[in-house]
From Swiss-Prot, chains A, B:
Record-linked PANTHER family: INOSINE TRIPHOSPHATE PYROPHOSPHATASE, INOSINE TRIPHOSPHATE PYROPHOSPHATASE/HAM1 PROTEIN
Family: Belongs to the HAM1 NTPase family.
The keyword Hydrolase belongs to this UniProt entry's keyword annotation: yes
InterPro entries per record: dITP/XTP_pyrophosphatase (IPR020922), ITPase-like_fam (IPR029001), RdgB/HAM1 (IPR002637)
Chain sites annotated for binding substrate: 10-15, 69, 143-146, 166, 171-172
Residues the record lists as binding Mg(2+): 39, 68
EC number: 3.6.1.66
Protein name: dITP/XTP pyrophosphatase
Signal peptide stretch: none
Length: 190, 190
């Protein structure tokens, strides 16, 4: 059976690959859409993703997914949180590790929000993974902060894992499995 | 002559005081409006302020000002930039100084954008001030990163200056003077 296609408003190949690894189990796959993504500035990832998905749906007039994720470091008051991508592009992993020099509490969590906008409204699926920030980057897979995030239950960083293994632990894998559940229950979005 | 009132979508008393110190020279003052501020996530302050001002105008049906500002640190790739307020609330001045430990290049600039939305559209006024990040916080006036910003032409931080002196140098003072110029030329916004 051929997988049904849902559009996703991203050009991040890693995100697409990770989500597709999960969605194949329910007979779907995502493909990038050329929609500009209007992001609202909010401390809630849910708001950012839902709003962007609605905007993309209005532009495309087809069901569309937006995924937004953030890394929340406990000792830094949740920083970089909803602005993880901007922070990654400016101070990067090096800056993050500098902020955590001599900081004992390395606890952090990743959160992913998948928003699916369709003719019936917008559905929001979330996934969270707790873990710690490594002392040094390890691994070359994945993207973003993956080289310094070690999820609970593993001694590897996300960047040391294949997609399938990362998805077992990851925030994005969990959110994508929630999306699968919804698709199984309600069928193809329109 | 009594000053004409323009609404401003902020609850930050420092911003209001600084803008009013300039606006009195052209016969206006701003007063806080109870409009929720929808911020778009953009790397351009102009977009954030203009969009928020339009939203506030639509909600209030009266001319309204939004001021948005950011601190751009050269050695940090422009960080914290448009997310200065969020970064201040999480890692704070302490985090910023930690990122700059052993960094020789302390150059930074503050930028302020004042957007005025009215029945004729939206006007955007900007002001920039170049300077350096101090080694340690000094002074207790102002707000945000003021204790660590030393503008070119002074040896004081913004937090060591009275409002009037800060306005002579500051990004916000410059943007407010641009607004004054516009108000003198076009009269009260409707």
């Amino acid at each position: 059976m051929e997988a049904r296609v849902i559009l996703i408003a991203t050009t991040n190949k890693h995100k697409i690959e990770e989500i597709n690894e999960v969605l194949q189990s329910c007979g779907y796959r995502v493909e990038p859409a050329a929609a500009s993504k209007l992001e609202v500035q909010s401390n809630r990832l849910e708001d950012v993703a839902a709003y962007a998905a609605i905007q993309a749906y209005l532009a495309l007039q087809r069901p569309v997914i937006v995924e937004d994720a953030g890394l929340f470091v406990e000792a830094l008051g949740g920083f970089p949180g909803p602005y993880s991508s901007y922070v990654f592009k400016t101070i990067g992993i090096r800056g993050l590790l500098k902020l955590l020099e001599d900081v004992e509490n390395r606890r952090a969590y990743f959160k992913s929000v998948i928003a699916l906008a369709h003719s019936g409204g917008v559905e929001v699926f979330t996934g969270t993974v707790h873990g710690v920030i490594a002392e040094k980057p390890r691994g070359d897979r994945g993207f973003g902060y993956d080289p310094v995030f070690i999820p609970e239950g593993s001694s590897k960083t996300f960047a040391e894992m294949e997609t399938q293994e990362k998805n077992k632990f990851s925030h994005r894998g969990k959110a994508a499995r929630e999306l699968c559940r919804w698709l199984r229950q309600y069928g193809p979005p329109r």
